[in-house]
Amino acid sequence: MNKKILDVLEYDKIKQSIRQFIATENGTKELRELVPSSDETEVRNALKQTLDAVNIYRLKNGIPVPRLEDVTEALQRLKIDAALNGQELAQIGRILRATRTVINFFDDLENEEIEIIALDQVIEQLVTIPEVEERLSNSIEGNGHLLNSASSELRRIRASITRIESDVRSRMEKFTRGNNVKYLSEPIVTIRNERYVIPARVEYRSKFGGVVHDQSSSGQTLYVEPESVVDLNNELRQNQVAEVHEEQRILQELSALVAPYTDTLKDNSRILGHLDLLNAKAQYAHQLKATEPQISASNEINLREARHPLIDQKKVVSNDIRLGGEYETLVITGPNTGGKTITLKTVGLLQLMAQSGMFIPANENSTVRIFEEIFADIGDEQSIEQNLSTFSSHMDNTIRILGNLNERSLALFDELGAGTDPKEGAALAIAILDKVRSTGAVSMTTTHYPELKTYGYERMGTINASMEFDVDTLQPTYKLLLGIPGQSNAFEISKRLGLDSDIISQARGLVDQDSQDLNNMIKDLTTRQKRAQKINQQAVELLKQAEEYHQTLVKGVDSLNSQRSNLIESAKEDANRIVNDSQAEADRIIKRLRKLEHSTGSFKENDLIDAKSKINALHQDTNLKRNKVLRRAKEAQKFHENDEVVVLTYGQRGELLRQVDKKHWEVQMGIMKMKVAVDELEKVKPDKTVKRRVHNSVQRTASAGVKTTLDLRGKRYEEALTETDRYIDAALLAGYDEVTIVHGKGTGALRSGITKYLKNNRRIKAFEYAPANAGGNGATIVHFK
């Protein structure tokens, strides 16, 4: 992108606005080098990264990148085996800690299932160096000062220094108290030439002995190191020298530790700077209330409620601006001071921002194009003097632009053809626009020449526009009116300002009829457009309300469906609980019936087996979409004596004897008579076979037909399990203590199914495979409780 367009559209001011949010020197460096890209892939990726940063800022207040210095120079010195100072090593330590923090931060985002579109590829390039980070953290403070923990020798030396200093100060302070005070200029202990001294009056020099290290400017005070502390100061000095040597050794050692990782550290520093810049872009977008620009697939610029980013966002007027698609040339006509130039700059600057990976101050779903170059000839639109030199300057610029245009160019012309004779200027403007269109470039032009209003109507792919003017307030509104050329308001303004009506009438007569007709047409178009915009706004609001109502209804339906599902699941569980209780009750009845063996009469055990099987068939899994128990609605019915019924509680068939009351019947079930609630009865069709009245006892007619072995070989899986269930019931009724189920070896699927069934059957006491000579694991012996 040419530098001139960046200067004309004040692109650097956008970067200055972003600069305030940057924390790292590398981020500042990347911002300084940032320019718009003409590569669509690069732009798309940059916008995706900014989108990630905006979402992170919204959810987590930004990526945790701290203030970091540029360590490039320090890393270069490491490559020649130079030792770094403490501050430089501390800076490297901060980069390593920031690297780990950022990686952990993005791991947390992943765990929280926060979607990251493009930055995950950037984060993958960061590399932690735990051993180096830990060593630096344990050795150096943030200001570069070496910690005592940097080495055991350094700790020992510093402990000695502390002890000796304490001894020296203790001895020296004795000279600042008592009778010695009168020999001092001031009762203090100070330092000269890195040694502890006292300020002795010159006439009492001999009272202290020792060494004189300095003298006051007046010559009346000597800074004396008393003889009694000379040896201690010497020892202190030796330890201080040893401390310096040990610190240098540690710095050399730490530098050698860091040196192999210079390339990794350089990359980490660069990536952290890039993330810092993305943070800044996100914060600037938040400040501007900017949105993500979409790259148009049809090469169309469609900016919705676009605002110039450098104007106070509380005062700036937003505009809808469309360019491309049906028309490639936009001509904004009308008088000056209405905001034409700002509109021109807004389009150009928002394009530069989008192609730099920035969000733009416009409503959502605004679209931009990717231009290879953007050119502009924008002068001082408020200039009163338009002389030949100005015209020549603009023409030189226009000639340069025309020589570089292609189908991937955007040309912005402010007051095209101005500065010369109006007729010649208008003719030149028309010819220049035709030339621009022939190159395939997109262009926006502002002009106050009326001839270009007709051009906007007559040329294919060209559209007129104007800036709205409020004749009531005599002020521009700065709103762009697409499709409507600018109209002159000179007569109306003059009338409102008080110009004599005779003068205005005479002036109107001097204007040709075509111009008057054109102005009247424009006025009518403006009125119609305002009416259409008002209707459209109402339609948009109604659509928004309808969408809100729709969302409310959808949420309501979802809530009802959820409640319905919960109720159904609850009902299924209740139904299955009732069925399980019925099974248990049926088992108890069967046991009681077995005890009637010595009674007279007879009872068919097959009837009991059938009844119990029907109870088992009632059970439904709770996750089924339709529950058979729930689906079977109980129909209203009347009962009569001798009707055959099923007692639902026990799953047994019986015969109605008499009605006890409105809610109860007496029922004969085999040898038992029971009082049963109407709700527990269900009428059934009578058996076609001849019934035999059960009298006082049960005769085991079925036991003789039940074998002690069940052979399932050759059976299908489901069929085998069903037959096993029936067989277990029959064997229990027959009074067997154990039985054998032959399932064969085969693939083991049937054997596994039988084992699972037996484990879950509460009537089974134990089971095991048959002995090797009796079938082995091809048969299972079952023991009943």
Swiss-Prot record:
Disulfide bonds: none
The keyword DNA-binding belongs to this UniProt entry's keyword annotation: yes
Coiled-coil residues: none
Gene3D superfamilies documented for this protein: 3.30.1370.110, P-loop containing nucleotide triphosphate hydrolases (3.40.50.300)
Enzyme class: hydrolase
Domain Smr: 710-785
Entry EC number(s): 3.1.-.-, 3.6.4.-
Entry-linked Pfam families: MSSS, MutS_V, Smr
InterPro entries assigned: DNA_mismatch_repair_MutS_C, DNA_mismatch_repair_MutS_core, DNA_mismatch_repair_MutS_sf, MSSS, MutS, MutS2, P-loop_NTPase, Smr_dom
Annotated GO MF terms: ATP binding; ATP hydrolysis activity; ATP-dependent DNA damage sensor activity; endonuclease activity; mismatched DNA binding; ribosomal large subunit binding; rRNA binding
GO biological process: mismatch repair; negative regulation of DNA recombination; rescue of stalled ribosome
Chain positions recorded as ATP binding sites: G334, P335, N336, T337, G338, G339, K340, T341
Keyword list, A-Z: ATP-binding, DNA-binding, Endonuclease, Hydrolase, Nuclease, Nucleotide-binding, RNA-binding, rRNA-binding
Domain of life of the source: Bacteria
PANTHER family listed in its UniProt record: OS10G0509000 PROTEIN, OS10G0509000 PROTEIN-RELATED
Record-linked HAMAP family: MutS2 (MF_00092)
Family as reported in the entry's similarity comment: Belongs to the DNA mismatch repair MutS family. MutS2 subfamily.
Function: Endonuclease that is involved in the suppression of homologous recombination and thus may have a key role in the control of bacterial genetic diversity.
Quaternary assembly: Homodimer. Binds to stalled ribosomes, contacting rRNA.
The protein, known as: Endonuclease MutS2
